[in-house]
């Protein structure tokens, strides 16, 4: 009798446990399938640091911009009836691939890792498990000079952030190059800024859908690096974006950088040049676009590089422009007038922002040696990075950046050219943006990233390079299998915590007493925080001398001596010819009148 009772108990226990497992399994599966406004999506569970993160990869957020939709603003998506399988990254947008250093991880880690296609408007969502209620959302916008980039890179994996800080991470693909930014201003067939409108539509998707994933649409922080940071700053200016996010983080980029925004004249000129190069020159603008729409995307990509009369390693051949829609006026004017979203911002730069670009064409520079250059090579480098600047303008840069204490030491010229490129293109614009923004009473926090990753594949002389804070922001060093040092793990943990705190509360400071308190950046004191593996410090007025040169002195030099951009090249050549004709005519007229006077009285 006793054994029968035991068997019954065991059977009951077996079926009870089986039922619990089935209930648990179906519960997990229910959590993985989420109903969006357009239809259901299926994600997948990932094991991260002994816990779980649910990833939804490759969710469509717009109609594929194919055929007649090429060069147009993105169109809203229609509904689907089946369950969308969001378990792998989608296509990357069409772009040129960096083939400068074949097989070298340092450059190839930034190349797209999924198929290239015009059908590329997809986004990714990482959510902590169990599904949160009202979690803060961080939306990543990748860099790549508006010419390249994709959300599926390993370095942009949102699972660590989601797991460690219980935030929701979102990233989207947006169109780049001519397919994303070609513009005939005023023409609805190619209005320009399509890539920015892609981003904006993804932000709208988050507002409509993130609650279903456990996110809070009223707590959304944008963060991006390089052109991604410039994009974030443009969303601060664009009235159509203001209601779609709460706060902003800008890593190594801002809209006032010299590469970030293209003038209307130049944007139009480049479109016409592309039309010429692809055999699409027509009298009628709409016919030009019609012809370009019928071209293979590869043909457009191949000709993109040749639309400017001169190029630099930082050339943005097709980028944001003032279209009267996304951007209502020149960004500098909008900033000056205070016409931007009033909110908290976190901004920063890396110690050696310029070095990454030197190995892409500056004389004497190579990733395979110490790149010790001469004064002459420094001058040649200035010609490459400042092709439209007068000789006097280049001379003023040379004078300001020469170390006159030891002007014969070759290492000084190598470092000086890196500083020139970094200060002019990244550090000083970011500081100036933060100063202007904070003058309107907004809390701003500024960082200076000083740590060179132990895993950096580029040579030692390149220092703390552009783009190499990203892995610390996304928490990659927390994955011990990746063999970062213990100090790097601690640094990354601190950065992740500060970024998440800023996103949640508008203040990056940690609650623990042992961490350095990050002060608010004000235009007077300009306090900033250094980020490194040794001792975090509070400093003031980063690169004040150099930035005063770029913001105050250099523009005056250009004004007095002429800074010739591509639009002016043609105009000045035409004016020069006209001036010669006029002088010739005047000389002949003077000659005629003098002869006439000498004839009087004969």
Swiss-Prot record:
Changing residue 198 to E: In BCHED; seems to cause reduced expression of the protein. Changing residue 153 to F: In BCHED; seems to cause reduced expression of the protein. GO terms for biological process: acetylcholine catabolic process; choline metabolic process; cocaine metabolic process; learning; negative regulation of cell population proliferation; negative regulation of synaptic transmission; neuroblast differentiation; peptide hormone processing. Inhibited by mercury. Inhibited by Tabun. Tabun forms a covalent adduct with Ser-226 that becomes irreversible upon aging. It catalyses: an acylcholine + H2O = a carboxylate + choline + H(+). Changing residue 322 to M: Does not affect enzymatic activity. The keyword Secreted applies. Its EC number is 3.1.1.8. Its main location: secreted. N-glycosylated. No other PTM detected. The major N-glycan structures are of the complex diantennary type with 1 and 2 N-acetylneuraminic acid molecules (Neu5Ac) making up approximately 33% and 47% of the total N-glycans, respectively. Only low amounts of fucosylated diantennary N-glycans are detected (approximately 2%). Triantennary N-glycans with or without fucose amount to approximately 13%, whereas 5% of the total N-glycans are of the oligomannosidic or hybrid type. InterPro entries: AB_hydrolase_fold, AChE-related_enzymes, AChE_tetra, CarbesteraseB, Carboxylesterase_B_AS, Carboxylesterase_B_CS, Cholinesterase. It holds the Pfam family COesterase. Keywords: Disease variant, Disulfide bond, Glycoprotein, Hydrolase, Phosphoprotein, Secreted, Serine esterase, Sialic acid, Signal. Glycans are attached at residues 45, 85, 134, 269, 284, 369, 483, 509, 513-514. One of its GO terms (cellular component) is endoplasmic reticulum lumen. Disulfide bonds join 93-120, 280-291, 428-547. Transmembrane segments: none annotated. Changing residue 65 to S: In BCHED; seems to cause reduced expression of the protein. The modification Phosphoserine is found at residue 226. It is found in: Secreted. Substrate binds at residues 144-145. It is linked to Butyrylcholinesterase deficiency: An autosomal recessive metabolic condition characterized by increased sensitivity to certain anesthetic drugs, including the muscle relaxants succinylcholine or mivacurium. BCHED results in slower hydrolysis of these drugs and, consequently, a prolonged neuromuscular block, leading to apnea. The duration of the prolonged apnea varies significantly depending on the extent of the enzyme deficiency. Homotetramer; disulfide-linked. Dimer of dimers. This is Cholinesterase. The gene is BCHE.
